[in-house]
Amino acid sequence: MNDQSITVRGKDRYKSGVMEYKKMGYWEPSYQPNDTDVIALFRVTPQDGVDPVEACAAVAGESSTATWTVVWTDRLTAAEKYRAKCYRVEPVPGSPGSYFAYIAYDLDLFEPGSIANLTASIIGNVFGFKPLKALRLEDMRLPVAYVKTFQGPATGIVVERERLDKFGRPLLGATVKPKLGLSGRNYGRVVYEALKGGLDFTKDDENINSQPFMHWRERFLYCMEAVNKAQAATGEIKGTYLNVTAATMEDMYERAEFAKELGSNIIMIDLVIGYTAIQSMAKWSRKNDMILHLHRAGHSTYTRQRAHGVSFRVIAKWMRLAGVDHIHAGTVVGKLEGDPNTTRGYYDICREDFNPMRLEHGVFFDQHWASLNKLMPVASGGIHAGQMHQLLDLLGEDVVLQFGGGTIGHPRGIAAGATANRVALEAMILARNEGRDYVHEGPEILAKAAMTCTPLREALEIWKDVTFNYESTDSPDFVPTVTPAA
């Protein structure tokens, strides 16, 4: 694109009237971002007839200091410093009419340690700007100076494993089904059977809070009774994610405190409670030595569409800053949205100390995490024991594998479903540790384990090779190609 700055300088810059954004200082192709700049990558789709550079400069302006006309009060500020600067515009491969806009923001534009303030600028009014057909925030580079103003995950992967005394394998969980309608007593029964059968965790679903069929306090009491009985029966540390999501912060704190009094080691919140509430609960969780699970309920309303919204990789970065310990991050092989390479990028953001740029995973920037704790990704939605070798290969061992229907839908009952998943996992971990090619030998390994485990045999028979093979709506724009040797 045009690599010449056309910024109007001097007194002409502040003459009353309307001026193109690219002439107001929001397009600076010669700008070299500072180490302390926040950098955002937007996918910009201008309306027909709108100059792409002007559209991208407008995004920079409207997400920082600009308004629709020149204002003389700009002269009362360090305007040159505080203007966001679009310094690079390039076409999106394979998407005619869309452009990547790289925009740098001075660190002083953002309140330290506040996701709400960051998002008010980056995804605020600019997303409704008329000259744009669509706008999507694809990725961000968050400088170390900014990262260090955040708490980060309240517990982190290492300490969570130490508390659970479980190492060297994925953790296993299940969401209680049906998610709505059970009484407290029957809900607790599901929790007990699943934990006794071999799972590490059970979990509330996103929309179970406090309804006429089951008050939250009743659910907490029955669930923790089940956890304690399962721990006594198995000799293992168990947990259940008690959803404390509620109408007000006061209600959420009350529920979290009650969970703590009952001896729970983990609570749960939903993404829909908002960024400030998430950070508040993360702060409470660290203070009270509680693992904090985040269900990403609602994210697909703005992460799933390729042209407009916010990429989940950005949400994952924000949530690592905010301080949650678990986040649902996709399964690749399950029923929910998840391109393999894109999902790997999400998992890397959660679990690495440093994320190098990997365009094939949709990661556009190097990202240093400045010693923030690692975030445990959670895989859930349409997975079952027959996919264990694929899940271990694709997602690694620092992950919670949530088999909801794949546990509770077992023909022999909940405990049998849990046992099937645990035996499948243990068989695959043993094969991996022995150096076997468990990815290609996976079906054979599972079949052999099933010879001495009736629940696993039945699980493999009923679900066989069930998969949800639909084309992903959000896949990387850059695909690695093999270069022939000279």
Curated annotation (Swiss-Prot):
EC id: 4.1.1.39
UniProt-recorded name of the protein: Ribulose bisphosphate carboxylase large chain 1
PANTHER family: RIBULOSE BISPHOSPHATE CARBOXYLASE, RIBULOSE BISPHOSPHATE CARBOXYLASE LARGE CHAIN
Residues bound to substrate: 125, 175, 179, 296, 328, 380
Other remarks on this protein: The basic functional RuBisCO is composed of a large chain homodimer in a 'head-to-tail' conformation. In form I RuBisCO this homodimer is arranged in a barrel-like tetramer with the small subunits forming a tetrameric 'cap' on each end of the 'barrel'.
Top-level taxon of the source organism: Bacteria
Positions where N6-carboxylysine occurs in the chain: 203
Subunit and partners: Heterohexadecamer of 8 large chains and 8 small chains.
GO aspect biological process, one term: reductive pentose-phosphate cycle
InterPro entries: RuBisCO, RuBisCo_large_chain_AS, RuBisCO_lsu_C, RuBisCO_lsu_C_sf, RuBisCO_lsu_fd_N, RuBisCO_lsu_N_sf, RuBisCO_lsuI
Record function comment: RuBisCO catalyzes two reactions: the carboxylation of D-ribulose 1,5-bisphosphate, the primary event in carbon dioxide fixation, as well as the oxidative fragmentation of the pentose substrate. Both reactions occur simultaneously and in competition at the same active site.
HAMAP family for the chain: RuBisCO_L_type1 (MF_01338)
Family: Belongs to the RuBisCO large chain family. Type I subfamily.
